[in-house]
UniProtKB/Swiss-Prot annotation:
Keywords: Ribonucleoprotein, Ribosomal protein. InterPro entries: Ribosomal_bL32, Ribosomal_bL32_bact, Ribosomal_zn-bd. It comes from Anaplasma phagocytophilum (strain HZ). This is Large ribosomal subunit protein bL32. The lineage of its organism: Bacteria, Pseudomonadati, Pseudomonadota, Alphaproteobacteria, Rickettsiales. Belongs to the bacterial ribosomal protein bL32 family. GO terms for cellular component: large ribosomal subunit. GO terms for biological process: translation. Disulfide bonds: none annotated. Gene3D superfamilies: Single helix bin. One of its GO terms (molecular function) is structural constituent of ribosome. It holds the Pfam family Ribosomal_L32p.
Length: 58
């Protein structure tokens, strides 16, 4: 089993974990339907950037 040769300091441990934090999703209000959706994604109505690009899933 691998064992560290030297103790990792709290600072180095925390720097190692700096990329593990969760990021909140970028949620915006869709101007065509008025519902919440992820930014830069097609809404459930099939609209993207004010234009219908896919069939509606609703």
């Amino acid at each position: 089993m691998a064992v560290p040769k030297r103790k990792k300091s709290k600072s180095r441990r925390n720097m190692h974990r700096s990329h593990l934090g969760l990021v909140a999703p970028n949620v915006v209000i869709d101007p065509t339907t008025g519902e919440y959706k992820l930014s830069h994604h097609v809404c459930l109505g099939g609209y993207y950037n004010g234009k219908q690009v896919a069939k509606s899933k609703v």
